[in-house]
Every structure is written in structure tokens, then in C-alpha cells.
Amino acid sequence: MLSINNRTALSSTRALKTLLLSAALISVGANSALAKTSDTTIHFAKGAISSVVTGKLKPNEQERWYRFNAAAAQYAIINIAPLTGTSETANVGVLHMPNGKYDGTKGGIIYQGCLPATGEYRLRIARNLMATHGETAGYKAEVMVLPKFASKSLCADK
């Protein structure tokens, strides 16, 4: 049988573990919420099918996040190009989709195809860590999303 001191120590240990786990989970949730609120919204002018965003990652920055809304079966193309006047290019692009999937690659056209779900899409633009010299990395990203009527023939079987 455990003594009162041992039972108290076990209860204290369990309480501490529960508290630490709760703090860790809250921290993860807060960081996730913070990441989404710091996304830059990509705006499309009325009647426009594309929007261009430019940016520079400082030497201590690794990535920048953007977001836009689109519908399932809309055809999209996302292209990342160098930004004039910067010695490095942030050329890694990954499109995070509302259904939890993601797709992307390094430089050029990082996504081309029919969007799989309706909702908020998040675009991560990052520097290529294998090809960086720690300088400012610029980028120019064009996001083109065709309207549903123009996407019909391209996404008919999707």
C-alpha cells in the first residue's frame, strides 16, 4: 500500500503532466491561429482572373503565406518568378487546399490544374534552403483562377 506522501507525489506528478500537455496543446493552437491571421489575402480586381503579389524575404525570414478563396472545379495556375533587384529568389511554392491536401514545387509554375475543393486556399512561398546565401530573396507570384464557366471544359471529368 502506498503511503500518503507517495500518493500525494503521484497526484502532483499527474497534475503537472496534465498541465504541461494542456499548455503545449494551447500553444500549438495559438501558433496555428496566428499563422492564419498573418496570411496576406490575395485580392482579385472585379472581373479579373489573375492577381500578382510581390515580396521580399529578409535574410532571417524563411517563408510568407497568402490566401484566396476559390470553388471546386475552377482551373488555376500559380507561377513564381524572380523579383527584379534581388540577388536571391524565393522560388518554393506550395498550395495548401481546403481538403487538407497540398501541391507545389520549386520555381516557375508551381500549380496548374482543377482545384479540388471549395474554400480557402493558402499559398506558402519560401526560399530554397539548399540554394540560399542568406540574402534577401524576392519573388513575384501570379495567381490565375478561371471562372467556373471558363473552367468547365478543362475540369469536366474532375
Regions picked out by a protein language model, each given a short descriptive name:
Residues 2-20:
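Bacterial N-terminal signal peptides that target proteins for export
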Residues 36-47, 66, 127-158:
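C-terminal edge strands of extracellular/lumenal beta-sandwich accessory domains
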Residues 51-62, 101-104:
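Extracellular beta-rich ligand/substrate-recognition surface
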Residues 58, 65-73, 113-118:
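Extracellular and analogous surface-interaction loops
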Residues 65-83, 123-125:
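Hydrophobic beta-strand segments within beta-rich accessory/binding domains
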Residues 76, 115-133:
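Noncatalytic modules at the cell exterior or secretory-pathway interfaces
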Residues 84-101:
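Short, surface-exposed beta-strand/strand-loop-strand elements in extracellular ectodomains
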